[in-house]
């Protein structure tokens, strides 16, 4: 099997666990956060820098790479790892979320989704088979099944149709996927409806994927509602297989997700807010572009050991961002990803020492300013 998973420790008082995810490009300790490299790059950072701050596995985006430069070109280059010079594991999403986010630019049928490119308006069609073809050409370590991500809020009727279609498409993905050095994960849908989540999980578990994602969350619903959905969805998934919460990456959600038994996360949040001049700190978000930091000669976070905090001040980084200098974005990106990687390291240590609940309380008290 291309991808396998071993649980190395289970916390007795919570759902948290530690594990090892084995892939063709190396073994990763879980829980793990995957920085997002949408266009085959973690924005502004070299692969070496991503590795230096603790990144071990990244996510790349099937929809974007299919449109530009094209999956055949990447296959010709020797696959995504060689193309982007990243030798660690890569997970590719299926493109489903992006295609369904296109709104009026897309048309859904049982066969798949017809859509217009957001780049040049050209017409395309994604089916489960096409999503598999593209991801097999990219050569990621883990591919994702093509699913229908229902928006929030949505009617029960819509969520039911999307859940049923997700199962049918998952079967077609299973049939079409035949790359032996690539694992294929299924995605549980069902919106915020408990019975639909149960049904989706049951049907996907029957298909026996090597790992399972929980999709359709972090799409605008309140965090408390997301935690409730996790509380009743995670126990439905096979304990011995990795569980991946898609698109979730704010520090508080990472802590709460691990407590509930999630092993894998990805999110654009740390890199996206960095480009808006916002830094993650233990005390919450710091909007360094604000005028109050113009004469602040302290680092983004005083106790942080990242390259940005060791060498530069808030005043300087603010100046760079206000002047639209790329270095400003690079420094906030380096800091934010370092912050998340350090957090994951601390979470793993807390789980190992059986103090995850205490860690959650201490972390959130500072982070949320309670």
Curated annotation (Swiss-Prot):
Q: Which residues form the active site?
A: 93, 266
Primary enzyme class: transferase
Keywords annotated in UniProt: Glycosyltransferase, Metal-binding, Queuosine biosynthesis, Transferase, tRNA processing, Zinc
Pathway this chain belongs to: tRNA modification; tRNA-queuosine biosynthesis
Where, by residue number, does substrate bind? Answer: 93-97, 147, 189, 216
Q: Which GO terms describe its cellular component?
A: cytosol
Provide any one GO MF term from the record: tRNA-guanosine(34) queuine transglycosylase activity
Catalysed reaction equations from the record: 7-aminomethyl-7-carbaguanine + guanosine(34) in tRNA = 7-aminomethyl-7-carbaguanosine(34) in tRNA + guanine
- GO biological process assignments: queuosine biosynthetic process; tRNA wobble guanine modification; tRNA-guanine transglycosylation
Family matches, as InterPro entries:
ArchSynthase1/Queuine_TRR, TGT, TGT-like_sf, tRNA_ribo_trans-like
Q: Which cofactor does it need?
A: Zn(2+)
What positions does the entry give for Zn(2+) binding? Answer: 304, 306, 309, 335
Q: Cofactor comment in the record?
A: Binds 1 zinc ion per subunit.
Q: Where is this region: RNA binding?
A: 247-253, 271-275
Q: What is its EC number?
A: 2.4.2.29
What is the protein's quaternary organization?
Homodimer. Within each dimer, one monomer is responsible for RNA recognition and catalysis, while the other monomer binds to the replacement base PreQ1.
What does the record give as the function of this protein?
Catalyzes the base-exchange of a guanine (G) residue with the queuine precursor 7-aminomethyl-7-deazaguanine (PreQ1) at position 34 (anticodon wobble position) in tRNAs with GU(N) anticodons (tRNA-Asp, -Asn, -His and -Tyr). Catalysis occurs through a double-displacement mechanism. The nucleophile active site attacks the C1' of nucleotide 34 to detach the guanine base from the RNA, forming a covalent enzyme-RNA intermediate. The proton acceptor active site deprotonates the incoming PreQ1, allowing a nucleophilic attack on the C1' of the ribose to form the product.
Q: Which NCBIfam families does its entry note?
A: Q_tRNA_tgt, tgt_general
The record's comment on protein family reads: Belongs to the queuine tRNA-ribosyltransferase family.
Name-wise, this protein is: Queuine tRNA-ribosyltransferase
């Amino acid at each position: 099997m291309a991808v396998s998973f071993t649980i190395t420790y289970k916390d007795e008082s919570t759902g948290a666990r530690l594990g090892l995810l084995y892939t063709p490009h190396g073994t990763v300790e879980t829980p793990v956060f995957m920085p997002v490299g949408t266009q085959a790059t973690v924005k502004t950072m070299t692969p070496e820098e991503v590795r230096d701050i603790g990144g071990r596995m990244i996510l790349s985006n099937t929809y974007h790479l299919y449109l530009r430069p094209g999956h055949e070109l990447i296959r010709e280059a020797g696959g995504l790892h060689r193309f982007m010079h990243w030798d660690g594991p890569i997970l590719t999403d299926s493109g489903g979320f992006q295609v369904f986010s296109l709104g009026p630019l897309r048309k859904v049928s049982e066969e798949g989704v017809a859509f217009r490119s957001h780049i040049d308006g050209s017409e395309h069609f994604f089916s489960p088979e096409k999503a598999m073809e593209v991801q097999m050409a990219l050569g990621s370590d883990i591919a994702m099944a093509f699913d229908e991500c229902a928006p929030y809020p949505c009617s029960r009727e819509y969520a039911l149709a999307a859940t049923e279609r997700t199962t049918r498409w998952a079967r077609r993905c299973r049939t079409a996927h035949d790359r032996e050095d690539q694992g294929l994960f299924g995605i549980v849908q069902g919106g915020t409806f408990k019975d639909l989540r149960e049904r989706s999980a049951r049907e996907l578990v029957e298909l026996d994927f090597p790992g399972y994602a929980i999709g359709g969350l972090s799409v605008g619903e309140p965090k408390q509602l997301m935690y409730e959905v996790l509380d009743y969805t995670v126990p439905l998934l096979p304990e011995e297989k990795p569980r991946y919460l898609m698109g979730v990456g704010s520090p508080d959600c990472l802590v709460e997700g691990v407590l509930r038994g999630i092993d894998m996360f990805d999110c654009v949040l740390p890199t996206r807010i960095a480009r808006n001049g916002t830094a993650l700190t233990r005390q919450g978000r710091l909007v360094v572009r604000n005028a109050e930091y113009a004469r602040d000669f302290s680092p983004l976070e005083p106790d942080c050991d990242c390259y940005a905090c060791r060498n530069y001040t808030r005043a300087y980084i603010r100046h760079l961002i206000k002047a639209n200098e790329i270095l400003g974005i690079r420094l906030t990106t380096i800091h934010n990803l370092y912050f998340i990687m350090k957090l994951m390291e601390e979470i793993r240590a807390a789980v190992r020492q059986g103090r995850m609940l205490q860690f959650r309380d201490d972390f959130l008290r500072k982070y949320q300013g309670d």
